[in-house]
Curated annotation (Swiss-Prot):
One of its GO terms (molecular function) is structural constituent of ribosome. This is Small ribosomal subunit protein uS11c. Part of the 30S ribosomal subunit. The keyword Ribonucleoprotein applies. The keyword Chloroplast applies.
Length: 130
C-alpha cells in the first residue's frame, strides 16, 4: 500500500528522560510529529511524507496516525514514558495523531493547542472549495 522509504543514517540509541514533549504540526498538506525532551532536544520525529505517503495522501488522518505511531515507538524504545502534547495547525490529522500516541503506549499528561490565531491581521487566502 505505502512504500517504505529507507534511510541510511546512524542513530544513537541513547536513553532519555521519562518525560518529554510531543509537537504535532498539522497542515492541510502534511503532518509532522516530533518528540523531544523537556529541554527541547529532539528524540524522534516522523512525518507523513517521510513515511512514504505522496501528494494529497500526506494530509489524511491515516497518514498522521502512521507517522505518530512510528515516532512514538522510537521514543518509547529510548525510554520515554510520559509526554505533553503541543498541537499546531489546522490540519485533519490532529486528533488522529493524539489517539495514535495513546494507542502506542505513551501516557499523555497535557494537551495544549498552540495554533496562532490573528487578531484580524493579514487577509486570509481564498476559501477552499471541496
Amino acid at each position: 500500500m505505502v512504500r517504505q522509504v529507507k534511510k541510511s543514517s546512524l542513530k544513537k540509541n541513547k536513553k532519555v528522560a521519562a518525560n518529554g514533549v510531543v509537537h504535532i504540526q498539522s497542515t492541510f498538506n502534511n503532518t509532522i510529529v516530533t518528540l523531544s525532551t523537556l529541554e527541547g532536544d529532539t528524540v524522534a520525529w516522523a512525518s507523513s511524507g517521510a513515511i512514504g505517503f505522496k501528494g494529497a495522501k500526506k494530509g489524511t488522518p491515516f497518514a498522521a496516525q502512521i507517522a505518530a505511531e512510528k515516532a512514538t515507538k522510537e521514543a518509547i524504545s529510548q525510554g520515554m514514558k510520559k509526554a505533553e502534547v503541543l498541537i499546531n495547525g489546522p490540519g485533519s490529522g490532529r486528533e488522529t495523531a493524539i489517539r495514535a500516541l495513546q494507542a502506542a503506549g505513551l501516557e499523555i499528561t497535557l494537551i495544549r493547542d498552540i495554533t496562532p490565531v490573528p487578531h484580524n491581521g493579514c487577509r486570509p487566502p481564498k476559501k477552499l472549495r471541496v
